[in-house]
C-alpha cells in the first residue's frame, strides 16, 4: 500500500491560498492571507477552502478498501483504475494481519487468489478462442472472477472538509483494517508537508469529544474518558457540567 501527495508545493501554501480566497469577505488586505486562512479553519468557516484539493496517487490498495474510499462523495474527485481497460492477471492481493498470523489460513488465502488469477487468465484465453473477444471485451467479463482484495490504484482529490470527514470515519477503530491503514498513510503524507493539519485529521471521537457509535463504541475507548453520544447528552444537561462551562467562560472573560 502506497500513498503519494501529488501537489506538495501547493499544500505548503494551503492556508495562504485559502486566505486569499476568503479575504474578499471583509476586504482584508491580502498580506494577511495566511493568517486569515488559519483563522477560518479554527472557526470552521470553510467556504473559502473549497477551491483547493489535496491530490493523491494511491497504489496497491485492496479493491474492497478502494470501494469504501469511493463512497466519500462531497468535496472528493476520483479516478480509479479500470478492471475493464487494464489487465488484472498479474496483480498481487492484500493479506489481513490476522490471516498472516496463521499458516493454514495464509495458505488457503494464497491458494484462493492464485486460483482466481489462473481462472481469470483462462477465461480471457477461452473467450478469445470461442467468441473472438479480445482486450477490454474479454476483461469486462473475466474481471468478475478476481477477488475483492486484489490490488487496485487510483488518483483522489479531497477538499480539507472532505479530508477531515474521511479521517473522522476511517481512523475510527471500528473501521476495517485496510481502509484505516490507508487513512493513516494519507494523513502521514499531508502532515509531513503541513504539520499544522495533524490536529484536524483525527478520529471523530477526538474531534467532537464523544463517540457516535454509542453501544458499539470500540473496546479501545470503552474505559476511556471519551463518553458515547448518549452519555454526553446526559452529561451536558447536568448542573455540574453547566457550572463548569460557566466558570471556564468567566475565567476567559476575566
Task: Please report, for each region that a protein language model flagged, where it lies by residue.
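Family-specific signature for flavin-dependent thymidylate synthase
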Residues: 1-254
